[in-house]
């Protein structure tokens, strides 16, 4: 039996936290309908982030390409996403907050070599 160091344990805990939050997220309905471009922005972000989450959960770490994509996305900011959450009210605001929490967890995962 091998013992894991503090870094590996922390990474495992973050993966478990990500899995729980993602499972909660995918089992909740999308908070809006219609053709509002702000809702479409939120849906697009959710889909994009979801593909990164699924890969990270499968491998237990962040793919290097996904890590780069997340860094670029964070550098560009979430202005449109924040605006949509603020303007569309509470169900969307809560949904966006959960997505940003998921993104924060992803960023904290180790990057696969």
What are these regions (language model features)?
Residues 1-8, 54-59, 82-84:
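Charged, low-complexity surface segments at secondary-structure and domain boundaries
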Residues 9-16, 36-43, 61-64, 68, ...:
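Short, solvent-exposed segments of well-ordered alpha helices
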Residues 2, 33-35, 101:
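Residue-identity detector for threonine
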Residues 3, 12, 46-47, 51, ...:
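Generic serine detector
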Residues 23-76:
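Amphipathic alpha-helical interaction modules
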Residues 1-25:
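N-terminal leader/targeting helix
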Residues 81-113:
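Amphipathic alpha-helical binding modules
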């Amino acid at each position: 039996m091998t013992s894991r160091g503090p870094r590996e344990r922390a990474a495992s805990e973050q993966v478990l936290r990500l899995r729980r939050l993602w499972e909660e997220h995918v089992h909740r309905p999308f908070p809006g309908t219609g053709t509002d471009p702000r809702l479409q922005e939120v849906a697009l972000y959710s889909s994009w982030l979801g593909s990164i989450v699924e890969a990270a959960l499968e491998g237990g770490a962040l793919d290097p390409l996904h890590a780069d994509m997340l860094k670029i996305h964070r550098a560009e900011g979430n202005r449109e996403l924040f605006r949509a959450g603020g303007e569309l009210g509470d169900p969307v605001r809560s949904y966006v907050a959960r997505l940003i929490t998921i993104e924060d967890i992803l960023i904290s995962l180790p990057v696969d070599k």
